[in-house]
Amino acid sequence: MDLQAQLEELKTKTQEALKQLNGDHSKELQELRVAVLGKKGTLTELLKGLKDLSNDLRPVVGKQVNELRDFLTQAFEEQAKVVEAAKIQAKLDSESIDVTLPGRQMKQGYRHVLTQISEEIEDIFLGMGFQIVDGFEVEKDYYNFERMNLPKDHPARDMQDTFYITEDILLRTHTSPVQARTLDQHDFSKGPLKMISPGRVFRRDTDDATHSHQFHQIEGLVVGKSISMGDLKGTLEMIIKKMFGKERKIRLRPSYFPFTEPSVEVDVSCFKCGGKGCNVCKKTGWIEILGAGMVHPSVLEMSGVNAQEYSGFAFGLGQERIAMLRYGINDIRGFYQGDSRFSKQFK
């Protein structure tokens, strides 16, 4: 058989072999490529026969060899695409998803106990005609201290260790600045001011079971004509009874806050022993729950409110303390660790 006939036979056999490799036969395809086009392949061996051809026939057969090489190279490339597509399809078929199977269930989250406490308190005050006012966590020293009757170098500032950002900018130590800003804007010709300001506050405390560098407060303020200590006591009694039960009683003890005068600490009768004395109330029958008092005249005057005509009361309570008392939580750090198992207890 002459060289030209052998070349045609190689072309025909290679085409037939390629047709057999329609599935995932990448290994077989590579072996066939090496056998036909490799350095020791069939086409290379046939090329060696060119030297035995006449001078007239050698260029003709040489051209035929080059054309065959190009043809077979393209044929192998096209078949490689077919084999790769078959390989991908086989993988897809083996890894197909049954859409009728139930999906993976997401773990259910729970509303944080502090969120629940805050919303409960807010609902109580909304029902009493109060408005809810939000404020800035990053506050000016002027509003955080001076407007609360705490001028620079006032000794009472030592009561609150503060995170200062600059000399005049700080992380608020209470939500009272919201009250000062609201007093500045309120139009008393339209009626008294009744507001609460919930939010997060910051103190330079060392974190332990009962202290945290951040915690939550809800402070309340009522300012109008003829507001008295009796109004304060009545408001606090209503709040305590709604939160801890109708049988709860309160008592007021004299205290000191720079922004109220007179100032009181508010105790609630122990909800564990009913006032008989236990480990929760330290055998006293009473639990300290919040601080309050009549708004200091200086605080009113700094907002342009006539302290001779208007009076008011203010109070502040902590959501963490209420939650710890209500649910017997003995470590405040649990509120901030982001553990869903903790929140699940209070769903």
Swiss-Prot record:
Native source organism of the sequence: Streptococcus equi subsp. equi (strain 4047)
GO CC, alphabetical: cytoplasm
Subcellular location, principal: cytoplasm
Subcellular location: Cytoplasm
Superkingdom, natural source: Bacteria
Catalytic activity: tRNA(Phe) + L-phenylalanine + ATP = L-phenylalanyl-tRNA(Phe) + AMP + diphosphate + H(+)
EC number in record: 6.1.1.20
Protein name as it appears in the record: Phenylalanine--tRNA ligase alpha subunit
